[in-house]
Amino acid sequence: FSGGGEKFRFYTVVDYYRDRSMLKKNTQDTRYDTTPTDTRLTVRTNLDVNVTKSTYLKLGIAGKLKELRGTRYGRNAIFNDIYGIPSAAFPIRHENGIFGGSSVYGDKNPIALLKHYGHIRNVYGSLLADLSVRQKLDMLTKGLAVEAAISFDNIGGMYETSSKSYRYMNSGASISDDGTLI
């Protein structure tokens, strides 16, 4: 948004971004969300005001909020395991509800790591503001002016992590001498 006239001008932009992973949401444990998510909101506003013919006021405000959520195991690590472990290496879960694993891949069951290993939630925020007033002093000397400015910056973050463990059972799979999974 932008507009104004001779005495007052403004510009504002708002940007919202949300990226939610293609991975299915954890519905078994609703205490926290382990689905990798990146949410951002950015706002920028500029105001220019001609207070008088020789006095100008400028105000700028920028704010940003960012929230990252996901599995405690890590965003990249979970995808490395999803693509690096064959789908038939072990059962996702055994009939008794215990997660599958193997002597080859250990306890790196991608579903268990995604939904039952814990979560992270990081929230960041920033607020940046500046104000300046400029007074022309042409009545004393042509081209002379005085300007005063002040600014305020505030940046913060909050980090939340939960840990959880899960049971897994070795399915007894191994790799033969010719490289076949047995």
Protein language model regions, located:
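Extracytoplasmic loops and strand-loop junctions of Gram-negative outer membrane beta-barrel proteins
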Residues: 25-31, 109-118, 182
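Membrane-embedded beta-strand positions in outer-membrane beta-barrel channels/transporters
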Residues: 42-44, 128-134
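Flexible, surface-exposed loop regions and adjacent strand-edge segments
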Residues: 27-34, 74-84, 162-173, 180
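Short, Φ-rich (hydrophobic/aromatic) sequence segments
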Residues: 142-144
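Carboxylate/His-rich catalytic cores and anion/metal-binding grooves
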Residues: 148, 155-164
